[in-house]
Amino acid sequence: MPNKRLMLLLLCIIILVAMIGFSLKGGRNTTWPEKVIGDTTGVFQNIFHTPAEFFAGIFENINDLKNTYKENERLREKLDGQTQYEAKLQELEEENKSLRDELGHVKSIKDYKPILATVIARSPDNWAKQVTINKGTQQNVAKDMAVTNEKGALIGKIKSSGLNNFTSAVQLLSDTDRNNRVATKISGKKGSKGYGLIEGYDKEKKRLKMTIIERKDKQDVKKGDLIETSGTGGVFPEGLTIGEVTDIESDSYGLTKVAYVKPAADLTDLNNVIVVNRDVPTVDTEEEGS
């Protein structure tokens, strides 16, 4: 029995080889067995080709999707880096502008020794009264030294009670303490108009209260007049900008005029400041004092 099966298998192989040989010869018609084999082969090729092509397309789409995802991730990282770069550039531009303003003010107070400092603390309970800066006695900061913002507008003076080796407390102009006085000079479009004395801060109006002490040639103090330090009190040097007059009233007795002054510095937003170091001893007087 095994021999018969082997003989049958060999016979089939011989017939198949013979048919292939005949099919390779040109110039003859295709036999029906060849047609059957060709049709059968074509059917199976068609059956397997379509799914194979379908799955090949799926794998190709998946590969394209992976490549697209990687490209999107790369572009997103690049965009994030660009955004961070732009934010850093904006920060540096603002810092550069602030430093330029400080430099310009330093040149304008060349008669004094400026000490550049940064506000490092501000208590919510004393928000309008004082700020803390990062310079102290080790950097030659002393009590009653005038302090300005980066544009040169007066914001206050160094408090003796808050003076340490490496930090200092600055008493702001917006402190309502009536002893927080500043001797002032009043100037209009045509020059000096007289002198005054800032004696406090009105929280409701958000203005400094200045008593008009002397008027030159009886000139009237008007809205828009410039108020600067006069330098006569022995604490604040002359010529520091304080603000401008926004309103004028008579006192409760009708004897003197009181001007309300809008500070030139934004006392609610302080960052970089300048301590004005004068080489003259400070003098405690009734006009200017702590």
Swiss-Prot record:
Keyword annotations from UniProtKB, A to Z: Cell membrane, Cell shape, Coiled coil, Membrane, Signal
Gene Ontology BP annotations: peptidoglycan-based cell wall biogenesis; regulation of cell shape
Keyword Ion transport carried by entry: no
Compartments, as annotated in UniProt: Cell membrane; Cell septum; Membrane raft
Record's signal peptide: 1-23
Record note on disruption phenotype: Loss of viability. Cells lacking sufficient quantities of this protein undergo morphological changes, namely, swelling and twisting of the cells followed by cell lysis. A polymeric material accumulates at one side of the division septum of the cells and the presence of this material correlates with the bending of the cell. After prolonged depletion in the presence of MgCl(2), the cells become very short and fat and eventually spheroidal, but no significant lysis is observed. Addition of sucrose results in rounded cells. Cells are still capable of making division septa.
Presence of keyword Signal: yes
Domain of life: Bacteria
Gene3D superfamilies for this protein: Rod shape-determining protein MreC, domain 1, Rod shape-determining protein MreC, domain 2, Single helix bin
Main location: membrane
Coiled coil: 58-111
GO cellular component: cell septum; membrane raft; plasma membrane
Family: Belongs to the MreC family.
Functional summary from the UniProt entry: Involved in formation and maintenance of cell shape. Required for the formation of proper helical filaments of MreB and for cell wall synthesis in the cylindrical part of the cell leading to cell elongation.
Subunit architecture: Self-associates. Interacts with MreD and proteins that belong to class A and class B high-molecular-weight penicillin-binding proteins (PBP2b, PBP1, PBP2a, PBP3, PBP4, PBP2c, PBP2d, PBPH and PBP4b).
Protein name from the UniProt record: Cell shape-determining protein MreC
The organism of origin for this protein: Bacillus subtilis (strain 168)
